[in-house]
Amino acid sequence: MTTPPRLVPLLEQFDWACLRLLNRMMGPEADSGTGTPIPVAPMSDEEYRWEPVPGCWSVRRRVDGPGPGANVLRGAGEWGRDSAEPTHPYPPPFTTIAWRLSHISEMLTLRADHTVGGHNLTSDSYRNSGDAVGAVMAFGAAAQAWRGALVSCDDAALDTVGLSTYPDGSDSEDVFIDIVWWVNQEVLHHGAEIALLRDLYRVRGGLTGRLRPGPGGYGGGSPACGGSGGRPPG
């Protein structure tokens, strides 16, 4: 099926945002922002769950219980993500890379399911990863699932209200192309937060050495989102 023309730039933006985040988390290279590749060390488990300030929300072993200000560990399995019911505290707690990455992956997985899947996944059934490699793989799989939902759409589907029945938002009241735009913003802004936390962890001594420009092209080895693997033109 031909991709609707108005979906093309949003799909390209999504592919690029996912590829850039994957490379920024696990390397071996990432784009410096000027087209110069820089070497990137893989994110460690310690960094993934690093709490830079007191009172962070994170992903925790269920046996350890929720973190400060949380009263529930959301998800299924050994690890849960800090949350609070009926409402989150204000101001919101500072969140770790683990929390932010789990949030993005859950959102993509559930939205894909509630668009082209069984329409039955919930945040309580999502399995969080306690290690960095598992979390990055989960993000890659979630991104692929959401991309699959996008490329299944024809032009009429983009204007359909309630095509996504994702329960943790206003999806049932929104045209689908607005949801596509919103999901891109979620990946972009949380991806930027994760990149900044990696920088902060590095300068606080968690990683040795300084990043230096390296030879070669843009790191195309990451299992991204089905795009071309390179930087979009322009």
Residue ranges and their predicted role:
Residues 1-126, 164-234:
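Short, contiguous alpha-helical
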Residues 127-163, 177-191:
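Acidic/histidine-rich alpha-helical segments that form the ligand environment
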